[in-house]
Amino acid sequence: MIQMSKKVSVSLMALVLLAMTATAGTNLAKSAKTSGVKWNPVMDAIIQVESEGNPRAVSGNSVGAMQITPILVKDCNEILKKQKSKKRYTMDDRYSVAKSKEMFLLIQSYYNRENSIEKAIRSWNGGVKYSVRATNRYYKKVMALMK
């Protein structure tokens, strides 16, 4: 009887861990929704500016609909590691619009805790330490597409 209850306990723990792992990606989307910011229009506008919606777009080291660089993938994986998540992104994930949006949301949740749309747009173009002057044109393009 004790062995049976141990097996049941181990099985239940495994199921709970599986459920937690499976929802890791959706937690980002949920937290983005609960923050009060509707990120989809921002991401969709960025996609139009970056690649005109082409998930196969390539420009130097940047690829995919959101033109993600290897450095950004590495940064996302470092954030996930700090969060003790087992999830990791690959270079091929940059070609997936859904995974690219997940990476965008992860970056925003880490570097843009105030959920500033302006900061999100400018930092996507100019990096975390962006220059307002250098990102003005990009910011205006994205904002124009959101209206």
Model-identified regions with their sequence ranges:
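N-terminal amphipathic/basic-hydrophobic helices that include classical n-h-c signal peptides
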Residues: 1-2, 121
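Bacterial N-terminal signal peptides that target proteins for export
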Residues: 2-12
